[in-house]
Amino acid sequence: MRFLKLKEVMEKTALSRSAIYRKMSEDAFPKSINLGDRAVAWVESEVDDWMEEKCQMR
């Protein structure tokens, strides 16, 4: 399992920071994991699965 920081998620998905957090609040994007003081990350496989779902919806 690999964690992605926000910058990596933004690069991987081409989404902005605000779009990622908006989609999370709408339950339309994987939730972040709290790693400690002001540090969050996403599970890479969950982000990959989300991207695959988007591709299949076209």
List where the protein language model places each region.
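Amphipathic, hydrophobic secondary-structure cores in small proteins
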Residues: 15-19, 30-37
